[in-house]
Amino acid sequence: YTLSLHDALPIWANNMETKSIMIVGVGGQGTLLASRILGAALISNGFDVKVSEVHGMSQRGGSVVTYVKYGSKVNSPIVNEGEADLILAFEQLEAARWLQYLKKDGTLIINTQKIDPMSVIIGNSIYPDGVLDAINKAGAKTTNLDALSLAVSAGSAKAVNVVLIGVMASHMDLNRDVWINAIKNTVPEKFLEMNLKAFDLGYNYNK
């Protein structure tokens, strides 16, 4: 789908090159809510934004990837190999699966949580060892964190997605208030306080 405020681009963004972000994880982790928060934050800042969601298996356990591209004018939502400026990975095996899409100078944020894929659950394979070591050897600018424990400390394991949005926000040139407003406009009110706490735990993770 396409989000756009055609005449609301800030002056500094009029000729901004297109940036590409990928949000990757497995079904049930809240990746789609995360992409909605990201899209809302970007569009409120005046960018042309295109979002494309791809579900390998949208039920719990299947790989889910969302492409988000933004700039002064975006033609296609699809991100090709070697084009992503940032990859937000909700699970370490998914980070490895999509690593080739990252630019050489791109940023990779990884939730170190392990979620067994269906092939492991049914006994056809085992979860590989050394995933994070292999990723780190690839030379990407990587932030590894246990987002699950931060989410639990915020009040719910389900807040992993907003913790990770907070970490991503700390790597981007958008004002914190833009993110807070995007969360307020996206998350149900009864979960708002918990999610704002989760966002700040992520946002301040490296500070």
Describe these PLM feature segments.
Residues Y1-T2, K137:
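Long, charged N-terminal interaction/targeting segments
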Residues T2-L9:
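Short, small-residue-biased leader/transition segments that mark boundaries at the very start
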Residues A13-K207:
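Active-site cofactor/cluster-binding pocket
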